[in-house]
């Protein structure tokens, strides 16, 4: 634990297993060599047999399994798990060993490679990484006395927290993100960039001079694949990683961020040395004092690197520049002693690598900035500037270092300076007598000219570059870039931090927008040409704190210098339509930010690129920072709608970190700035606001629409009807100052069929069973229902969707396999009295006749009619035999048949029966004369269609014949009781339904005093006919397409009539078996009963 950090841990861990094996072999050889020497001390067999491990010690090695050595750095102490990455180890510990997660998990030290649990790591940091306290108080009384003496002074603790970035792979750390990123490029990605690097000493750089370019030794290298010539080795490595390998996310993942306790810095004193101190040395003594009192606590080697970048150019010339003029302490170490500067006088000053950051901002030590000869404050007005019209610039030595410069004589006129500086000169008197400008942006930002290598204040630099180098000023807008500080910006599309040197290339990927017409360009040259042609007379708006400037030199044709001014997103001057603005300022009543500025900016529409164009009208492709999906449409609307619908968050600003982040739309909880999409998923599982009504913000934004809709469906219909008025209102509200209340469509709440609350902690099978219950209630869930179920049950959406899909497929397979039938428990007679929209077939449409004859067995009648239509010449003989048998049995009535003697075999479908019903009085007279012989005829006629249909089921079905048959005799074309006439009247037969009347009067015979056997036979016949009717419903073409030569002759029935009762019972048993009806086609009864007009079937539609 208390050892110094060991390097090359990977190599040591790989060799450790081999070392253990070698040591074990050496020990085994030693034991074999000395076994003879210790034999005299060996006990006898009695003690060996009666001694166990428990007699020696409590630990039995035979009960434990020898665990293999784990070469990965993060090893779990409770199980054999090990991982190379700390994130995987942490996830394993959280999921498997969550009972004591905080105290048992290994944590990595942010300063070195030491890993330990929480308590041990705290001790480790206190011993090895504790800051040096400056002067701790001896006792509490002295501390109180000190506070009493310094009561008027501001309280300062001995130490403060400093935010630093650190490399997760080594001990390197730095307060600047860019420095740590460059370190990773140089130290940890050499193997990635090595195949792409090529030496090109004979090739020179292109004419473009990038920002801060230096004459370094790496300038002779270039990329093999695309011939990219970088300004440094780190730039080439970044180019390879970003453009060719596309593994930039790995670099981002290797950079960590933490807060370090460092001692509070003392005021920095940069006293000019005496003239006799001029001598050549590697490091001036002043830098040593700077390292001890700097704001950041850095290792000595890193501080030297920061203050002397680049290393090769820190020579005697650079040191001499530190001590050429007597200077006193100022914010930048610059203050005059004499009356003024002569024209030829030169003044040199040594600054840190990034002077505005490394030098502390002590406003009490700042008195004047670049004063004139009479000691007057350097005002921004032209009157104060007149006595010292000097341009102060710091020129770097050898055109290489940003940290050293020379103060030169000026050539800038008074009018040129007042043009740029006059923006802040409205109150010159207040500027002269007011507080010192130590905290203003103009005193904190210096820029170096990339062409003449001179250092300027930022407000003077833009005018210098435009006038001296004939630079063309090109304005642009990139509202997706948030400027963090001078060296780092954040892309709101990609949710990535970008350094200054790669920011322009990244913005060109998304596109820069014209501030006047909102055209998007991915090339600076095309944008500059667009400005020259279209907006040549337009005036530039005032420069804000969020403006980024880039100096470029184009090589097309002649050298063209371009000063690109990009207006980025800033919360302070964001328009009212900004989503992040509303997230940061979210009182119940929407505020009106900057009303005066907006009114002035709306009059000259093209003068201000930031305020004139509303933020929400940026039209283009938007990239979601959470799921990286491409969104099309207005940037603000599309991104806000996507975040709300897909991720259920809205943009806001973190109240502590002051960074752009998101908050939950259900519970209004704010996520941290380094959250991901998986963080939202985990939160939604346990969010208490999910499923409740929308939050108060949505109710205030759209109170009328939410009150109008009591249920889900009216909301959608109401919104569709109000779509065009709402669009019109949006357009009117965009022009006004107040923010629009109709900015977002309110999200309709999801109503679940079953409440999944309480099932998230159940087992996997229990949650699946809940989904099955939900499927029985709602088999077709919507997308949002699936998302809500996934969030509530802690399941993947794909699992839930596949579960519902499998259930639906199983239902379909079961329906096809088991052929389920739906029993309609309707009283059809009563149903016909009611007006309804149900459409029944002609078979089930009954007329309201008397109670006794309301139910007519239509299928039995159809069977008789089918038996009557025979094709062969023997059919007439069969009818004669039937008449003879009926006469012998004593039947008093004779059925009359008119049969066409010759029927064509080609068209058996044309053989259609024509029914001529008799009067009701005649049928009643015949009912009284019925005897036993007629019942046998009834039994035989009942049996006959069953056999015929059993034979007809073997034939193939012809769909065309069915259609033609239905067209010939459609039941819907005739009224109730009308005569059905087919299209082929030539092949028809006519008969009088005397026998049918006999069949329809079986109910009276059942009530009469007949034998029990006859009653039983009649009841079984009715059940048989009903079963045949249900099984043969829907198709009749199998019967009608049967060749008439295959139909059975009536002579075959003569023998059956001799013993009708036995054969009828056998046929009844066969029909009850049901197997023969499974092969029968459906739909026989519909067309067949439709042709029977005299059986009290109604063809009217209900």
Swiss-Prot record:
InterPro entries: ADNP/ADNP2 (IPR038861), ADNP_Znf (IPR045762), HD (IPR001356), Homeodomain-like_sf (IPR009057), Znf_C2H2_type (IPR013087). Its main location: nucleus. The modification N6-acetyllysine is found at residues 1035, 1042. There is a cross-link at residues 39, 72, 144, 155, 203, 231, 266, 274, 278-279, 311, 335, 367, 408, 427, 600, 606, 616, 621, 632, 658, 699, 716, 728, 731, 745, 807, 829, 835, 914, 930, 935, 1016, 1035, 1042 (Glycyl lysine isopeptide (Lys-Gly) (interchain with G-Cter in SUMO2)). Residues 692-711, 971-982, 1058-1069 have a biased composition (Polar residues). Residues 354-443, 691-712, 851-1030, 1043-1102 are annotated as: Disordered. It holds the Pfam family ADNP_N. A zinc finger (C2H2-type) spans 74-97, 107-129, 165-188, 221-244, 447-469, 489-510, 512-535, 622-647, 662-686. Widely expressed. Strong expression in heart, skeletal muscle, kidney and placenta. In brain, expression is stronger in the cerebellum and cortex regions. No expression detected in the colon. Strong increase of expression in colon and breast cancer tissues. Gene3D superfamilies: Classic Zinc Finger, Homeodomain-like. One of its GO terms (cellular component) is neuronal cell body. The keyword Membrane does not apply. The modification Asymmetric dimethylarginine is found at residue 348. Residues 393-433 have a biased composition (Low complexity). The modification Phosphoserine is found at residues 98, 409, 413, 608, 709, 736, 738, 805, 876, 878, 886, 889, 921, 953, 955, 1071. Residues 354-361 are annotated as: Neuroprotective peptide (NAP). Interacts (via N-terminal region) with beta-catenin/CTNNB1 (via the central armadillo domains); interaction is direct and stabilizes CTNNB1 by modulating its phosphorylation by glycogen synthase kinase-3 beta GSK3B. When isolated from the sequence, neuroprotective peptide (NAP) provides neuroprotection against the amyloid-beta peptide. It is linked to Helsmoortel-van der Aa syndrome: A disorder characterized by intellectual disability, autism spectrum disorder, and dysmorphic facial features including prominent forehead, high hairline, downslanting palpebral fissures, notched eyelids, broad nasal bridge, thin upper lip, and smooth philtrum. PANTHER family: ACTIVITY-DEPENDENT NEUROPROTECTOR HOMEOBOX PROTEIN, NEUROPROTECTIVE PEPTIDE-CONTAINING PROTEIN. This is Activity-dependent neuroprotector homeobox protein.
């Amino acid at each position: 634990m208390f050892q110094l950090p060991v390097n090359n841990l990977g190599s040591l861990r790989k060799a450790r297993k081999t070392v253990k094996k070698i040591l074990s072999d050496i020990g085994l050889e030693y034991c074999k060599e000395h076994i003879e020497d210790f034999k005299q001390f060996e006990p006898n067999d009695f003690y060996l047999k009666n001694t166990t491990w428990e007699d020696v010690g409590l630990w039995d090695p035979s009960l434990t399994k020898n665990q293999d050595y784990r070469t990965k750095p993060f090893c779990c102490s409770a199980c054999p798990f090990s991982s190379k990455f700390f994130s995987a180890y942490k996830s394993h510990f959280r999921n498997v060993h969550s009972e004591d997660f905080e105290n048992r998990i290994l944590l990595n030290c942010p300063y070195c490679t030491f890993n330990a649990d929480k308590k041990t790591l705290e001790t480790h940091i206190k011993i090895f990484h504790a800051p040096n306290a400056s002067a701790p108080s001896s006792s509490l009384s002295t501390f109180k006395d000190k506070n009493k003496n310094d009561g008027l002074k501001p309280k300062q603790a001995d130490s403060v927290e400093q935010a630093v970035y650190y490399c997760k792979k080594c001990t390197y750390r730095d307060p600047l993100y860019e420095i740590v990123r460059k370190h990773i490029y140089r130290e940890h990605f050499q193997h990635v960039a090595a195949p792409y690097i090529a030496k090109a000493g004979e090739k020179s750089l292109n004419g473009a001079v990038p920002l801060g370019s230096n004459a370094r030794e790496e300038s002779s290298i270039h990329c093999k694949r695309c011939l990219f010539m970088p300004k440094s080795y780190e730039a080439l490595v970044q180019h390879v990683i970003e453009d060719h390998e596309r593994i930039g996310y790995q670099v981002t993942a290797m950079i960590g961020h933490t807060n370090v306790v460092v001692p509070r810095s003392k005021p920095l004193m940069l006293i000019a040395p005496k003239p006799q101190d001029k001598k050549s040395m590697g490091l001036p003594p002043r830098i040593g004092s700077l390292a001890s009192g700097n704001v950041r606590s850095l290792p000595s080697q890193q501080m030297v690197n920061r203050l002397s970048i680049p290393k090769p150019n820190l020579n005697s010339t650079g040191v001499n520049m530190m001590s050429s003029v007597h200077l006193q302490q100022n914010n930048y170490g610059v203050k005059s002693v004499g009356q003024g500067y002569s024209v030829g006088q030169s003044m040199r000053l040594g600054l840190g690598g990034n002077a505005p950051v490394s030098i502390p901002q002590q406003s009490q030590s700042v008195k004047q900035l670049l004063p004139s000869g009479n000691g007057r404050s350097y005002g921004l007005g032209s009157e104060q500037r007149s006595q010292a019209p000097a341009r102060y610039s710091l020129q770097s030595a050898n055109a290489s270092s940003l940290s050293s410069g020379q103060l030169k004589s000026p050539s800038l006129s008074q009018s040129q300076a007042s043009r740029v500086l006059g923006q802040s000169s409205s109150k010159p008197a207040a500027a002269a007598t007011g507080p010192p400008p130590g905290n203003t942006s103009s005193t904190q930002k210096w820029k170096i000219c990339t062409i003449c290598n001179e250092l300027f204040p930022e407000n003077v630099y833009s005018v210098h570059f435009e006038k001296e180098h004939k630079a063309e000023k090109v304005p642009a807008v990139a509202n997706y870039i948030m400027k963090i500080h001078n060296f780092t910006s954040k892309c709101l599309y990609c949710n990535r931090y970008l350094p200054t040197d790669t920011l322009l290339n990244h913005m060109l990927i998304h596109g820069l927008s014209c501030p006047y017409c909102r055209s998007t360009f991915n090339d600076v040259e095309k944008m500059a040409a667009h400005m020259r042609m279209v907006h040549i007379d337009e005036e530039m708006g005032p420069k804000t704190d969020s403006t980024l400037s880039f100096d470029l030199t184009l090589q097309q044709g002649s050298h063209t210098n371009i000063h690109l001014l990009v207006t980025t997103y800033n919360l302070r001057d964001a328009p009212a339509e900004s989503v992040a603005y509303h997230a940061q300022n979210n009182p119940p009543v929407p505020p009106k930010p900057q009303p005066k500025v907006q009114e002035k900016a709306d009059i000259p529409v093209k003068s201000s690129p930031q305020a004139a164009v509303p933020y929400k009208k940026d039209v283009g492709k938007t990239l979601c920072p959470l799921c990286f999906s491409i969104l099309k449409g207005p940037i603000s609307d599309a991104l806000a709608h996507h975040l709300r619908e897909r991720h259920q968050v809205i943009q806001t600003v973190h109240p502590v970190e002051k960074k752009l982040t998101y908050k939950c739309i259900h519970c209004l909880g704010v996520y941290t700035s380094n959250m991901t999409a998986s963080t939202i998923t985990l939160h939604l599982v346990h969010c208490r606001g999910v499923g409740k009504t929308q939050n108060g913000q949505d109710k205030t934004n759209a109170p009328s629409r939410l009150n109008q809709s009591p249920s889900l469906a009216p909301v959608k219909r109401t919104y569709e009807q109000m779509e065009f008025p709402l669009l019109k209102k949006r357009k009117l509200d965009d022009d006004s100052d107040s923010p629009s209340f109709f900015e977002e469509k309110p999200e309709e709440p999801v109503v679940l069929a079953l409440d999944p609350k309480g099932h998230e902690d159940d087992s996997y099978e229990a949650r699946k069973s809940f989904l099955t219950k939900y499927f029985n209630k709602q088999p077709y869930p919507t997308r949002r229902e699936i998302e809500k179920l996934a969030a509530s049950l802690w399941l993947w959406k794909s699992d839930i969707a596949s579960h519902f899909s499998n259930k639906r497929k199983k239902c379909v397979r079961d329906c096809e396999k088991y052929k389920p039938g739906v029993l309609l428990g309707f009283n059809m007679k009563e149903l016909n009295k009611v007006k309804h929209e149900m459409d029944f077939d002609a078979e089930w449409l009954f007329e309201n006749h008397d109670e006794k004859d309301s139910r007519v067995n239509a299928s039995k009648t159809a069977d008789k009619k089918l038996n009557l239509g025979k094709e062969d010449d023997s059919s007439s003989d069969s009818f004669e035999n039937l008449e003879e048998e009926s006469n012998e049995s004593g039947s008093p009535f004779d059925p009359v048949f008119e049969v066409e003697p010759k029927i064509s075999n080609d068209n058996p479908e044309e053989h259609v029966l024509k029914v001529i019903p008799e009067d009701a009085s005649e049928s009643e007279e015949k009912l009284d004369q019925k005897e036993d012989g007629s019942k046998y005829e009834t039994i035989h006629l009942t049996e006959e269609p069953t056999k015929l249909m059993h034979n007809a089921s073997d034939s193939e079905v012809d769909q065309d014949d069915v259609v033609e048959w239905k067209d010939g005799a459609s039941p819907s074309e005739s009224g109730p009781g009308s005569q059905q006439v087919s299209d082929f009247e030539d092949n028809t037969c006519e008969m009088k339904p005397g026998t049918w009347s006999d069949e329809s009067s079986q109910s009276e015979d059942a009530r009469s005093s007949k034998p029990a056997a006859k009653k039983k036979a009649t009841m079984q016949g009715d059940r048989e006919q009903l079963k045949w009717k249900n099984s043969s419903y829907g198709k009749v073409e199998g019967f009608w397409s049967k060749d008439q030569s295959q139909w059975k002759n009536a002579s075959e029935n003569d023998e059956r009539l001799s013993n009708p009762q036995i054969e009828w019972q056998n046929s009844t048993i066969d029909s009850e078996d049901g197997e023969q009806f499974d092969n029968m086609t459906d739909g026989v009864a519909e067309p067949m009963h439709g042709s029977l007009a005299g059986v009290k079937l109604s063809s009217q539609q209900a």
